[in-house]
């Protein structure tokens, strides 16, 4: 290892190597490779480290010693700080830490931010640095039918020129639905844990990997069986029982449960704080081998002692690395089919989620003969099971209105677990699709996931209708918009979709448009999400129909396990509050909003039913456990953007002194010509300090912490031993509200293409908006463009061009809301800047690139944007004009089309190279 190689370090969950007897370290020269390899995590060897002069070492030997000692120190740290179960004496820990400090002082290249020497107490965190894999970590090609699997099997036999009468040893394994992981061990010590990433570089998650109990910090077994260096590939996952336990804990703590074990494992493995990961009960199975080096002085010599996959698994078992118990050795295609059939019938019976069967040629020499494509080995394949289908009840069919007015029927299902997550709703696309499927409300229906991702209602189970005909009813698409009451109709004759024509003021459409303009694809206002958009445009959503379900003072209903809530009796004389007028009636007022405008906005919330029971904790003490079990049907209002009234905190003597110093500094600055406004600024999102609002009297309560943007709504009189004290009760914009206004200020200077997307022009998405903005240069030019002008831009089709021209034509109509929005935004400084020319090198000028499948480092849109930013054309289909096709996971027919046409197919790594250089 070179001395400038940066390593990231992590810790274990307390499982360190057992203390072994002296292995003869005294016979090796201190500082030699043999001496370093013979060191053990014992007190005696810690003393040896403390006495050793690191200045006598070479840089390479110092790096080896640092790696070994750092791993032990981090194991000690997690055992002490996370597990509260120290495994080393204080003297041994201190000696190892001093050794690291001396090494880093003598060899500065070893001193990096991830070193244990930079960690204060129990402060552990990850930065997920990108690290190159020692050897490439490839993904697998998928097949979805037995015919495709047989084609692959026959191609292997053919490419190896294997005699038909001779059995070909293969390994059959269940495909774990988890996250791929590369474990790097040097001299038997866990050095790093990396995610797959793009296969060439992955994220360093070593800190979190060390918390997984089944991953050993040190490889066990006889010394002659432990190599100098090895990459162990495998899968991190969560067992079903651990997943259910975690979700119960999430619900008890009032947090949302995870949708499936894979999501739970992914979220747990990417925690910034590894102490959280340590509580998540993650598991690991090894299933592959990367680089393996025994070293010249190894007892077995320099030859490769692992001849096949099964031998690697035997070694893993000796080392204490877990391997799946479901692996099978097979020698014929029929045995592969037997494995597929067995686990197809027993998918729900094993300890973890699975999504297929992996078949590998067992012999490593034959694997090398077969080689690999640009992204996957030819010696392995993943057979994916057909989409899992389950039955459930169709409770109802509702409709939702989208941002362009399209009205879509949505199936409301009795929640059912299918292919890794719980499904409770799925789109039915349009009324014609409902009729085509022949479904009735109340039917038992078949649900599956298309591609194991998108929920799909297949159709009814007809035999379940017998005797229940009177409980079923046909769905009829509404005549009027459920949100605004406008009459629905197709946009043009022959359309299957029906739309709400009330584009300007339909609350549902406006809400969806605000959500869209705040999204990452447009203005990227992160803290203006769905709930904030509803509060701005339709705060009376969920308003109760009558006072019978209005409970202004009930935020939750507590019940004992198994009990039902008591009936609710409204207080006599109680009336529903007056309906609120939305703050936004269209998008035009968005950038004129102030925090003061949002002070009185309230939204409706349902009181939860919370089950409370007592349990005994690990310390023997009783504690109450709360679990949300449903909604009560009772509604109350809560502030949407400001905090609830809260007593101000009294300042400590130290805080009062600091405030006095700050005020003195401001006064001094003012006497030198600076203004107070330059020093303190105005509250975020307000045109004037909120202190000018009625009821504000912060100056009257100098001993309390009353923020500059707060309003005192009342004064409570608190009786203490010294008498009656006046306590100001304040409200202020919430933290999310303050962040929202900050982000809106930044959005005023958004790129022109983002402004175009934010205008919600039908059919116009980010990639095409970029093309138009880049070609036209300014909003004024786009406003006056013709269809011919726009279609002259490479990549802009006639339908999109027509939509853009029609939208801007509407802005010129007197009283049209689109014109009002455009003028208001321009007055606020939005869209007045000309489009900036890309500062990136135009490496793809004149090139057409198609992206298919999912990439690790890019979303579908960001990949297209990366191509366009570099002067290329991001096409949606493969043709003879295509220059490159980027192949991601689960690539479909486009990959086959590219292969058929002989178009170069790129991995994600090659795509990154293409973006950077324009060549491969």
UniProtKB/Swiss-Prot annotation:
Residue positions of the active site: 175 (n6-amp-lysine intermediate)
GO molecular function: DNA ligase (NAD+) activity; metal ion binding
Pfam families reported for this sequence: BRCT, DNA_ligase_aden, DNA_ligase_OB, DNA_ligase_ZBD, HHH_2
Cofactor section: Mg(2+); Mn(2+)
GO CC list: cytosol
Listed Polar residues bias regions: 669-682
Keyword Ligase on entry: yes
EC number: 6.5.1.2
Domain BRCT: 839-920
Chain residues that bind NAD(+): 90-94, 139-140, 173, 196, 235, 360, 384
GO terms for biological process, alphabetical: DNA repair; DNA replication
Binding-site positions, Zn(2+): 481, 484, 500, 506
Protein keywords: DNA damage, DNA repair, DNA replication, Ligase, Magnesium, Manganese, Metal-binding, NAD, Zinc
Enzyme category, top tier: ligase
Catalytic activity: NAD(+) + (deoxyribonucleotide)n-3'-hydroxyl + 5'-phospho-(deoxyribonucleotide)m = (deoxyribonucleotide)n+m + AMP + beta-nicotinamide D-nucleotide
Positions of region (Disordered): 659-691
Keyword Zinc attributed: yes
PROSITE patterns, A to Z: BRCT (PS50172), DNA_LIGASE_N1 (PS01055), DNA_LIGASE_N2 (PS01056)
Function statement: DNA ligase that catalyzes the formation of phosphodiester linkages between 5'-phosphoryl and 3'-hydroxyl groups in double-stranded DNA using NAD as a coenzyme and as the energy source for the reaction. It is essential for DNA replication and repair of damaged DNA.
PANTHER family: CHROMOSOME TRANSMISSION FIDELITY FACTOR 18, DNA LIGASE
Family label: Belongs to the NAD-dependent DNA ligase family. LigA subfamily.
Full protein name: DNA ligase
Organismal lineage: Bacteria, Bacillati, Actinomycetota, Actinomycetes, Bifidobacteriales
